[in-house]
A protein has these predicted regions:
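Gly/serine-rich nucleotide phosphate-binding loop at the start of the catalytic core
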Residues: 1-48
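Alpha-helix boundary/capping residues
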Residues: 30-33, 45, 59, 257-260, ...
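Positively charged, low-complexity intrinsically disordered regions
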Residues: 38, 58, 227-230
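Active-site-proximal, Lys/Arg-enriched surface segment
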Residues: 43-113
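Single, function-defining residue in the core of a domain
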Residues: 2-3, 7, 12-19, 64, ...
Length: 338
């Protein structure tokens, strides 16, 4: 009887493979599975973010002081000519427009243990579902609030998501947010005054330390937020806004905002150790299933890394330890002539 092939078999392949994450490579190294069976399974099953949420929820260590992080990443498909769901879009890593598949991700951070978990994601494919990245964020937000009911205090997100619609949704739930503003965001110190770019504001020495109250264009009259000027380098200054009007420290705002880089760490790890962006299948369904499996693999690696206090990279590299010892003891290909 043939072994039943499931997505967990594919996950196992992604977990142990070091460089090549193609179905062909999987089939070449499996004694029981052919490429056709693997490809057929990946085109027929329909994995969704629900699988990730269920797996991640059992691993979460929750905190009332928790953080919810939203951001997006692009799976590089610049050499693709026929993969469905690939579109030209801005890549923050590349600092330019590339061909790829966009993913909006959500990460939960426990500041008490300094641990984090990916808890949800959405694939950005407006030609198929008509949804913007902000629509996907709000879908995940509603799931967090009404379905998962995860405890947290603060939301961190990129300037792309600093829209009134998102900010008001967070405020309605009594949560705080910190997010950078684009340098051309229109702002004023008085709702009756003329608006100007946020990067044109003048700052007193005291305001540089404690922030200033501002009004964003299109927000309701009297709706004030706290703005902080964070000097990142000689060539970069961030303007971070929060609805926590009690916040009076630029240094603390910098520390709060720095937590957002946990989601960048997740993106980097997922791409480097799970083959997240390595799928070459043309079918959008196979691509979606591959992404879902890669997410599950990261959750598993993260679980082991937290239990052993190792990094995900060390865990992945450790799979080669036995191979290296054996090859050094008795190499398959010798450096020396017989």
């Amino acid at each position: 009887m043939k072994k039943k092939l499931t997505h967990l078999d594919y996950c196992q392949f992604l977990l142990v493979s070091q460089v090549n994450y193609t179905q062909t490579y999987f089939a070449d190294h499996s004694e029981l599975l052919s490429h056709d069976r693997i490809n057929r399974m990946m085109r027929q099953i329909k994995l969704t973010p629900q699988e990730l949420r269920q797996r991640a929820r059992s691993e979460l260590r929750l905190s009332e002081n928790g953080y919810i992080l939203f951001d997006d990443t692009v799976l590089d498909k610049r050499h693709s000519t026929a993969i469905e769901s690939v579109r030209r879009q801005w890549s923050g890593n590349e600092k330019r427009v590339i061909k790829g598949i966009g993913i909006v991700t959500c990460v939960y951070v426990n500041p008490d243990t300094e641990q984090f978990w990916v808890i949800d994601y959405r694939i950005f494919d407006p030609d198929r579902d008509g949804k913007s990245k902000i629509d996907h964020l709000l879908d995940m937000w509603r799931t967090i609030i009404h379905v998962e009911q995860i405890p947290f205090r603060t939301v961190l997100m990129d300037s792309w998501y600093a829209s009134m619609k998102v900010m008001k949704a967070i405020e309605r739930e009594g949560k705080f947010y910190y997010c950078p503003l684009k340098s051309n965001r229109q702002i004023t110190l008085d709702a009756e005054a003329t608006y100007s770019r946020v990067d044109s504001l003048t700052w007193t020495p005291e305001e540089l330390q404690t922030g200033k109250l501002v009004h964003l264009k299109k927000f309701p009259k009297g709706h004030l937020l706290k703005l902080f000027r964070l000097v990142v380098s000689t060539h970069r200054t961030d303007y971070v806004v929060t609805n926590d009007l009690s916040q009076d420290s630029t240094d603390d705002t910098r520390d709060q905002s720095a937590i957002r880089w946990k989601i960048e760490q997740f993106h980097r790890e997922a791409k480097q150790v799970t083959g997240l962006e390595a799928c070459q299948c043309r079918s959008q369904r196979a691509q979606r299933n591959h992404i879902a499996c890669a997410m599950l693999v990261w959750v598993r690696l993260n679980q082991i890394a937290q239990a052993t206090s190792d990094s995900i990279y060390l865990l992945k590299q450790g799979l080669l330890d036995d191979y290296m010892r054996e090859q050094l003891r008795c190499p398959s290909i010798s450096m020396f002539s017989a």
